[in-house]
Amino acid sequence: MRLESVAKFHSPKSPMMSDSPRTTASDSLSGTDVMAAMGMAQSQAGFGMAAFCGKHELSQNDKQKAINYLMQFAHKVSGKYRGVAKLEGNTKAKVLQVLATFAYADYCRSAATPGARCRDCHGTGRAVDIAKTEQWGRVVEKECGRCKGVGYSRMPASAAYRAVTMLIPNLTQPTWSRTVKPLYDALVVQCHKEESIADNILNAVAR
């Protein structure tokens, strides 16, 4: 079972899973099976499960849990980023909270996010390769150049920068780009990594 199945299980319109017992290994998982698998996955990959469940609006509590996990990770690695490492206690904590909140929001974006769908590919992540289409006489697609194949635009890092400058008024754009934004980017990447870990664990425990 994959994480996407968890989202479908929580959808009232999804017929894929039910509480009826399985008759063969290939039958749909029962509600009890799913909840047991989720519990095991949460015990081993709490960050990834919270990140995914919050992303898919399955739980508001999971959203906050994911941000808290991300803040813990940010604090752990902050010493590698000069613009954050030099900050004093309370200011540093607030900056990490801002970075974690915006990074998680970026991770949560999708083609379904209002205003985020790519204007060129309309959320498909694919675009027509005009040169090859003319060469081969049939439609040939390629990765969308605007969104790099994801189907949506990322949250502008400038939004996080503006929020951080409320706490560090003298933070210039160049300094942000060199010494703080790399941490912001690392937090977004970490969310995706943790989701992947949770997905693999869930698949293993629900075989």
Swiss-Prot record:
Residues 171-192 bind DNA. Residues 20-29 have a biased composition (Polar residues). Signal peptide: none annotated. Zn(2+) binds at residues 118, 121, 144, 147. Residues 1-29 are annotated as: Disordered. Keywords: DNA-binding, Host-virus interaction, Metal-binding, Transcription, Transcription regulation, Transcription termination, Zinc, Zinc-finger. The record marks 134 as: Interaction with host RNA polymerase sigma factor RPOD. InterPro entries: Antitermination_sf, Antitermntn, HSP_DnaJ_Cys-rich_dom_sf. The keyword Transcription applies. Mediates the switch from middle to viral late gene expression by associating with host RNA polymerase (RNAP) so that the latter can read without pausing and through transcription terminators preceding late genes. Competes with host factor sigma 70 for binding to RPOB, the beta-subunit of host RNAP. To join the elongation complex, binds a specific DNA Q-binding element (QBE) and interacts with RNAP that is paused during early elongation. Participates in the lysis-lysogeny decision by activating the expression of the late lytic genes. Interacts with host RPOB (via flap domain); this interaction renders host RNAP resistant to transcription pausing and allows it to read through termination signals. Interacts with host RNA polymerase sigma factor RPOD (via domain-4). Interacts with host NUSA (via N-terminus and AR2 domain); this interaction releases the autoinhibition of NUSA. This is Antitermination protein Q. It comes from Escherichia phage HK022. The gene is Q.
